[in-house]
Amino acid sequence: GELAIVTGAIRDEGTSLHYIPADFPAVAHYEVVQALRKAATAKGLAHRVGISQSKDSFYGEVEPEHSGVTQRLLDRWKAWEIGGAICSEMEASTLFIVASMLRVRAGGIMVMHGEGELGSLEPLIETAVLAVRELIKGDQNA
């Protein structure tokens, strides 16, 4: 599927709240985002750059009709889409918050897919490795 390069994440989860209040944004480091974009473009891979929703419940998104708060989940996802969210996952916001607290760079790249098989993760892995190599090279030249 198409790659999602995440610039920031909606903090729709609880873990990151144990590090800093919810008012603090969960954002990727711009150098990591740039390196991921450059790598995906160099490999000729379809990709989108944007915001992700980080959530606590996998099945709340995949099967909201089996929840006691079905309409709330559907309404919230619709709001995130209207705001420009391109994907949903369960880790990025906490990763970005912890990276901010530790003053280290972090980014996120995911494979977007809907129904059916996910397919190979090789393009994602190769893109991430190429981006990390670019970051290392940039650090060595700085």
Where in the sequence are the language-model features?
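Accessory terminal and edge-of-domain segments that mediate assembly/interaction
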Residues: 1-142
